[in-house]
């Protein structure tokens, strides 16, 4: 049986090894095919880059030709536009001159017409006033003639003296009335003249306002003409500058230096075109890599989510197993309870039998009482032990329940953690997608990579000095406290001393210090730096590490990690070589202190 089992296991082992070898072969084939595909892809990419560069160069030459032709067309169109503008300017000037002359003539005629109107109004008013005066004088004459006639008649009738006096007063009053009427008429005439003068002045004011507006329009037209003249002056200045530049053109003069500069500029433009093409191809490659990283993140998130569900299933299986175990324990306890009940029933039956035969066994009462007392004591002890056992069981159940609650909380927290990790990965993937969609491509400043170089120490110490310094450092670092050494026994102290010496010997070898800034004093750091080979690394590696810790999708992490690994390997190789060379030369020097310590006293005792 055992031989069959061994043969079966060997067969299974062979099958597993064969399957492993097949899997390794398939993996190698896949890797080789992937490498071939990558090489083909690189070749195709290089071919595409060369083709695009050639097309871009042709495009650049054609653009230059098109630019030259467009410049010629622009120059011709500029000349045509200049001639048109000159003709337009001439026409505008003529129109302005004609409009100005016409406006001046119109203004002169308007002023003449207004003057004639004013004179006409004044003549009409004077004529009206004179007519009114003539009519008034006629009325006065008629009144005076009537009065004279009346007076003559009354005189003839021989009126009394009183009547004559009254008549004289009446005539005087009438004369005063007439004089007052004349004054009123004169004042009315004066008022009419003033009103006419006011109307004339208002007309003059309106005319002056119109003239002012016309003068303002003329000033605006003059200002526009001045601005146009300034623009024309600027155009002429630009044309003059262009003419000066054309006069100073190196191609026209045939200067070799400027021609060389022009050739260099054309070469730099071609190089710029090639760099642009390469940049576009690398940009597309970067976008493809980002998409692959996005897919990987989504796959990781789904795997984390599946892992969370798997852990939940494992927890369920574990809880079911614990439930089955507890059910078995409960069944076992129920069986024990039944056995105890049977034993109790038998004990009660045994106690009932001696009570029936009590009349026959009166002599053996002493032994029965003694046994009864022992049984009672044993029962009490059993009950106390049962109580303690029940208390312990309750405590155990309480602790198990508490442990189960803690485990449930732990599994719930783990599940929440995994779900949160998966959600975090999904959110990161979404954030990367949104960045790729909406954020513009930032100008990435390419860091200038410094070359790695080895800085050898100037003041090289001898092997003995190095051993002395290293032994002093080892003694300072690996020195045990005296209190602990006194408490230990002599053999242990000797063994510790040997271990201490071995440690100090192992530490005396110089090491390549990749991070010299540790918890050491300044003078010790200086001593170590004199004995070590410094590696001045590339600053881009630190940036790559920082970007790696931040999980930024934009940073080329794989290249930075590979560079870092290669540099660390080179540093290790150089450090191992230096260790081998120094281990051959260095020998540990032991220093024994003059004071008596327990380490030195134990061998003497």
Swiss-Prot record:
Chain intervals with Basic and acidic residues compositional bias: 564-580
Keywords assigned: Acetylation, Cell cycle, Cell division, Centromere, Chromosome, Coiled coil, Cytoplasm, Cytoskeleton, Kinetochore, Mitosis, Nucleus, Phosphoprotein, Ubl conjugation
Spans annotated as Disordered: 544-580
Post-translational modification: Monoubiquitinated with'Lys-48' linkage. Deubiquitinated by USP45.
Location of this chain's protein in the cell: Cytoplasm, Cytoskeleton, Microtubule organizing center, Centrosome; Chromosome, Centromere, Kinetochore; Nucleus; Cytoplasm, Cytoskeleton, Spindle pole
Matching InterPro entries: SPDLY_chordates, Spindly/BICDR_Dynein_Adapter
Protein's UniProt keywords contain Phosphoprotein: yes
Modified sites of kind Phosphoserine: 513, 515, 555
Gene Ontology biological process terms, A to Z: cell division; cell migration; establishment of mitotic spindle orientation; mitotic metaphase chromosome alignment; mitotic spindle assembly checkpoint signaling; protein localization to kinetochore
GO MF term list: enzyme binding; kinetochore binding
Residue ranges the record marks as coiled coil: 2-442
Major localization class: cytoplasm
N-acetylmethionine PTM sites in chain numbering: 1
This protein's GO CC annotations: centrosome; cytosol; nucleus; outer kinetochore; spindle pole
Function: Required for the localization of dynein and dynactin to the mitotic kintochore. Dynein is believed to control the initial lateral interaction between the kinetochore and spindle microtubules and to facilitate the subsequent formation of end-on kinetochore-microtubule attachments mediated by the NDC80 complex. Also required for correct spindle orientation. Does not appear to be required for the removal of spindle assembly checkpoint (SAC) proteins from the kinetochore upon bipolar spindle attachment.
Alphabetized HAMAP family for the sequence: SPDLY
PANTHER family: BICD FAMILY-LIKE CARGO ADAPTER, PROTEIN SPINDLY
Quaternary structure note: Interacts with KNTC1 and ZW10. These interactions appear weak and may be transient or indirect. Interacts with dynein intermediate chain and dynactin (DCTN1). Interacts with the catalytically active form of USP45.
Similarity section: Belongs to the Spindly family.
Name of the protein described by the UniProt record: Protein Spindly
Organism per entry: Homo sapiens
Name of the coding gene: SPDL1
């Amino acid at each position: 049986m055992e031989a069959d089992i061994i043969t079966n296991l060997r067969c299974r082992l062979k099958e597993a090894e064969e399957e492993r070898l097949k899997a390794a072969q398939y993996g190698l084939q896949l890797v080789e095919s992937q490498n071939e595909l990558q090489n083909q892809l690189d070749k195709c990419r290089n071919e595409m880059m060369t083709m695009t560069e050639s097309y871009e160069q042709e495009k650049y030459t054609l653009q230059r030709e098109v630019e030259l032709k467009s410049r010629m067309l622009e120059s011709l169109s500029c000349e045509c536009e200049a001639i048109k503008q000159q003709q337009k300017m001439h026409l505008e000037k003529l129109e302005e001159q004609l409009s100005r002359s016409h406006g001046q003539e119109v203004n002169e005629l308007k002023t003449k017409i207004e003057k004639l109107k004013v004179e006409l109004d004044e003549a009409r008013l004077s004529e009206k006033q004179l007519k009114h005066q003539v009519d008034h004088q006629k009325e006065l004459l008629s009144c005076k003639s009537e009065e004279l006639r009346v007076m003559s008649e009354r005189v003839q009738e021989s009126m009394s003296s009183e009547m004559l006096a009254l008549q004289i007063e009446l005539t005087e009053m009438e004369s005063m009335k007439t004089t007052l009427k004349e004054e009123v008429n004169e004042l009315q005439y004066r008022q009419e003249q003033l009103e006419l003068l006011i109307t004339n002045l208002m007309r003059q004011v309106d005319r002056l306002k119109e003239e002012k507006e016309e003068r303002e329009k003329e000033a605006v037209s003059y200002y526009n003409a001045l601005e146009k003249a300034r623009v024309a002056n600027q155009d002429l200045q630009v044309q003059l500058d262009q003419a000066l530049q054309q006069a100073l053109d190196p191609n026209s003069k045939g200067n070799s230096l400027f021609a060389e500069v022009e050739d260099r500029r054309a070469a730099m433009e071609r190089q710029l075109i090639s760099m642009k093409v390469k940049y576009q191809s690398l940009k597309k490659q970067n976008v493809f890599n980002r998409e692959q990283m996005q897919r990987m993140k989504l796959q990781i998130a789904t795997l984390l989510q599946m892992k969370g569900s798997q852990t939940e299933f494992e927890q369920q299986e574990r809880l079911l197993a614990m439930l089955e175990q507890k059910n078995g324990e409960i069944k076992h306890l129920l069986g024990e309870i039944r056995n105890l009940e049977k034993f109790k029933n038998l004990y009660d039956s045994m106690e009932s039998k001696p009570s029936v035969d009590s009349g026959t066994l009166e002599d053996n009462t002493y032994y029965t009482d003694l046994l009864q007392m022992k049984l009672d004591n044993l029962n009490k002890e059993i009950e106390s032990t049962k109580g303690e056992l029940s208390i312990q069981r309750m405590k155990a159940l309480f602790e198990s329940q508490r442990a189960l609650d803690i485990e449930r909380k732990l599994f719930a927290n783990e599940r929440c953690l995994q779900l949160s990790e998966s959600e975090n990965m999904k959110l990161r993937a979404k954030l990367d997608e949104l960045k790729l969609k909406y954020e513009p491509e930032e100008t990435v400043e390419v860091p200038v990579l410094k070359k790695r170089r080895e800085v050898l120490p100037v003041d090289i110490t001898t092997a003995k000095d190095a051993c002395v310094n290293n032994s002093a450092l080892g003694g300072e670092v690996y020195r045990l406290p005296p209190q602990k050494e006194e408490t230990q026994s002599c053999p242990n102290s000797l063994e510790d001393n040997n271990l201490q010496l071995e440690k100090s010997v192992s530490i005396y070898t110089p090491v390549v210090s990749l991070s010299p800034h540790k918890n050491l004093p300044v003078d010790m750091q200086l001593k170590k730096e004199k004995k070590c080979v410094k590696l001045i690394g590339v600053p881009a590696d630190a940036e790559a590490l920082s970007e790696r810790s931040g999980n930024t999708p934009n940073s080329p992490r794989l290249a930075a990690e590979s560079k870092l690994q290669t540099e660390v390997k080179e540093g290790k190789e150089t450090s191992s070589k230096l260790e081998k060379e120094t281990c051959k030369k260095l020998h540990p020097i032991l220093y024994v202190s003059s004071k008596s310590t327990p380490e030195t006293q134990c061998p003497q005792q």
